[in-house]
Amino acid sequence: MLYENRVITKKEVKKILKGLENLKKEKFEKKSSSEDIHELIESLLIKRIGIDAGGKMHTARSRNDQVALDIRMKIRDDINIICQCLLDTIKSLVQLAKEHQETIVPLYTHLQQAQVGLFSHYLLAYADALFRDLDRLYVTYGRVNENPLGAGPIGGTSIQIDRQSTGKMLGLKGIVENSIDATTTRDSAVEYIAAIAILMTNLSRISKDFSIWSTSEFSFLQLSDEFSSPSSVMPQKKNPDILELTRGKTSHVIGNLTSMLSTIQGLPSGYSRDLQQINPSIWSASKITISALLVMESMLKSVIINKKNMKKAAEDGYLIALDLAEKLVHNGISFRKSHQIIGRLVKIAHKSGKPISELNKSEIKNEIKGKEVSLELLIKLIKSTTITSSLHDRTSQGSSGISEQKRMVKHRLGKINVYQTGIKKRSNDVQNSLNKMNKKVKALTK
């Protein structure tokens, strides 16, 4: 860019670029008197090509805008990696959902059985949450992928430069225009960590559910040995270590976000050395999130689902209660009155230790006295209502109804394809820009 704007000569740009290419092949000493990597590279370049040419490399730039650029480019790359890993995890969830569209399972509120549902419905719920994480990262990417370079230390420069051109060469879309804003703020980095903190929270919740469901008390699923560990003293144990570590690492990412906000909230305008303290939090959160997604995807592909235990748990409860109440509503009885009637039947069935379907005529009759409901109708509804029929009856959009599962699985698979195209294009756009820049470098160094 400096050469194109006639700030340096062709001879100088050739010496600088060749010198930098040679430095890429060298190993740097860990101990150096240089303050940071930028100063080290400049000092090494000057030693090799002289200060007349090497001393011009830093023209119209500052470490303040260089560091801001480096952080943005690193986050940009991490977002693309995380988006691909996240999409792969969503694929695993949706594929598992496709295989379990008729696998019956209890749905819980307050950790108490609430309604009968389908395992696919549960899996799609988390797929949808992760899709929103993907959306957040997509939006954040746009704010991250902007060029702060050329802002100088804080107030810009009198030297003729082209910030748009620099950004284009690096695959950045537009510039962070205000030079104070470009060098001072790190809100795009905070936004990124906030997005992956929410993402990790969703992974933690999946881990919690799977951890509970893998216990002998539930035995809804079994983790493969790859994602479990034995006890050192108890031979029967199979501990869900990976799920527990995912929960634990989520706390680290949330801590990283809190640390960054705590650092930034007290800073004045302009660059302060405090900003260096947030960088380890960014790198740590990225690394944890990528690892957690890779593990989650693999775990979902290998988990063994115990359909029989899931269905038995659903049959042993009173999960058709709401469905019975709604059938009374279909027959002209108010929902509140229906709720009271079925509630009484559940209570007597629970006391008797049997399902509602096994209540006899006299037991039902005693509980509906004065309720203005036909005994014959109620008995007919009880006999015809099962957990399976309930799932066929549910047709509201987004419900656990069997027909809705087929529609939602198909829709989510299509959504995955759209996102995959977008992620690939975004990565290709960056790589194409860098390739063009490298061609320019080669042409100038011939």
Which residues are covered by each model-predicted region?
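A helix-coil-helix interface module used to build multimeric assemblies
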Residues: M1-G156, I161-R163, G167, F227-P230, ...
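Charged, flexible cofactor/metal-binding loops and thiol motifs
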Residues: I71-R72, I79, C83, L87, ...
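Leucine-rich amphipathic alpha-helices with coiled-coil/heptad-repeat character
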Residues: K27, L93, A97-H100, I104, ...
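Helix N-cap/coil-helix junction residues
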Residues: V7-I8, L172, I333, K354
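Short, well-ordered beta-strand elements within core beta-sheets of diverse protein domains
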Residues: M1-V7, K74, H121, V190-I198, ...
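Short runs of predominantly hydrophobic/aromatic residues within well-ordered alpha helices
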Residues: H38, E42, A189-Y192, A321, ...
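Glycine-rich cofactor/substrate-binding loops
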Residues: A53, M234-K446
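A short structural micro-motif
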Residues: K18-E26, R186, R344-A349
